[in-house]
Amino acid sequence: LQSSYNALMGQINPHFFFNSLNGLNSLIRAGEQEKTLEYLEGLSNVFRYILQSNHKTLVSLDEELQFVKAYTYLLGVRYEHKLFFSIQVEETYMRKKLPILSLLPLIENAVKHNVISKRHPLQIQIYTKSDNWLVILNSIRPKMEETVGHGIGLKNLRER
């Protein structure tokens, strides 16, 4: 179990940590005190969830979406006015169980493999369909250069 957890943690984009600290640094330098405090709270929630994830294999959709909201808030600060998230999940689905951190690789891949600019903002939607489907949909604007990756995040998600 511990080795599986360590493998999962290694798959979370290591640049996320550094980008988060750079985002925090930018907010501090800009004197954005209120935004800095919100950002710190979001960062704290993200890391708390990740650290506590070694004790769970399944979580409710509600728990996973709370994590996603904190994570996407951090991304939103980094990609201000270029990245938009929409979550529309019916209350009846919130108790459904899914593997912990299962939405993260889908969001990371959308960000990693698409152009994100003011002219072409990335839109990611998470919603439910009446036939028990959870849908993660994003606008597709592939980057011109191929992003090198090994597909480990999606492979891990399929295995879980």
Language-model features: where?
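Two-component histidine phosphotransfer core
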Residues: 1-159
